[in-house]
């Protein structure tokens, strides 16, 4: 079943990034992720209670008992938003390195090197393209996230905001990471989304496992490059090259 095959890519990706030849391409984005994580968590710890109070609806006294039921939902909602912010910022900053990591993983998996050799000049040349692609992801993400954020403030409706955020987050994890190998092969944005939709259940399986792994503090720092490697395996084994427009 596709939904069951998707999660295995993350575990295999974790094994791949432990190989000596890939460690250099893991250490650089890992260091970036660590810095972003430390800064964001420090800020979030100071503001966490305020954010939960801001999102929590005001209940009349006779419904006060419901506060203890809905409070965990809003704590989870804040955690999900913090998670999204960290993932988005870290991936934007480390995008060129993630692109190179995806290239090298594909070389290992396929056993042949169809990409230019690594050089700092090549990395610098990738920055405009990868940043442009990250901005395209941001343009896809922000309007949908804004709708969910507005729903989070609507009394009653905000009770379903958390599960909607989670489902959207699972899909975005697939989009975020599988786009690295797709972009390396110059697959257009709309074509990439169409291909992912054709693999919807496998994508949700991979995205769901990635989502869960990235929610775990500190573990998520290692799992981000593992997700890049796993997404590259997904691209190769699910025959992503067939989506390329010749």
From Swiss-Prot:
It is a multi-pass membrane protein. One of its GO terms (cellular component) is plasma membrane. The chain crosses the membrane at residues 24-44, 69-89, 148-168, 214-234. One of its GO terms (molecular function) is high-affinity sulfate:proton symporter activity. GO terms for biological process: cysteine biosynthetic process; sulfate assimilation. Keywords: Amino-acid biosynthesis, Cell inner membrane, Cell membrane, Cysteine biosynthesis, Membrane, Sulfate transport, Transmembrane, Transmembrane helix, Transport. The keyword Transferase does not apply. Pfam families: EI24. It is found in: Cell inner membrane. InterPro entries: CysZ_sulfate_transptr, Sulfate_CysZ. High affinity, high specificity proton-dependent sulfate transporter, which mediates sulfate uptake. Provides the sulfur source for the cysteine synthesis pathway. NCBIfam families: PRK04949.1 (NF003433). Belongs to the CysZ family. This is Sulfate transporter CysZ. It comes from Pseudomonas paraeruginosa (strain DSM 24068 / PA7) (Pseudomonas aeruginosa (strain PA7)). The lineage of its organism: Bacteria, Pseudomonadati, Pseudomonadota, Gammaproteobacteria, Pseudomonadales. The gene is cysZ.
């Amino acid at each position: 079943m596709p939904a069951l095959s998707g999660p295995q890519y993350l575990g295999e990706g974790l094994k791949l990034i432990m190989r000596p030849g890939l460690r250099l391409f893991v250490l650089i984005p890992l260091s970036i992720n660590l810095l972003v994580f430390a800064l964001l968590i420090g800020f979030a710890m100071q503001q966490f209670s305020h954010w939960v109070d801001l999102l929590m609806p005001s209940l009349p006294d006779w419904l006060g008992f419901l506060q203890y039921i809905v409070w965990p939902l809003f704590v989870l909602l804040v955690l999900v938003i913090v998670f999204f912010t960290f993932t988005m910022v870290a991936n934007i900053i480390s995008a060129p390195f993630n692109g190179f990591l995806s290239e090298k993983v594909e070389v290992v998996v396929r056993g042949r090197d169809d990409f230019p050799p690594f050089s700092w000049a090549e990395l610098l040349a990738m920055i405009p393209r990868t940043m442009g692609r990250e901005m395209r992801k941001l343009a896809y993400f922000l309007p949908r996230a804004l709708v969910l954020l507005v729903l989070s403030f609507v009394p009653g409706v905000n009770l379903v905001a958390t599960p909607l955020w989670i489902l959207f987050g699972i899909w975005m994890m697939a989009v975020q990471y599988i786009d690295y190998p797709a972009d390396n092969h110059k697959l257009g944005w709309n074509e990439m989304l169409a291909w992912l939709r054709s693999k919807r259940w496998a994508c949700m399986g991979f995205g769901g496992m990635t989502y869960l792994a990235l929610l775990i503090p500190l573990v998520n720092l290692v799992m981000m490059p593992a997700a890049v490697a796993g997404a590259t395996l997904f691209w190769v084994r699910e025959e992503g090259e067939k989506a390329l427009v010749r």
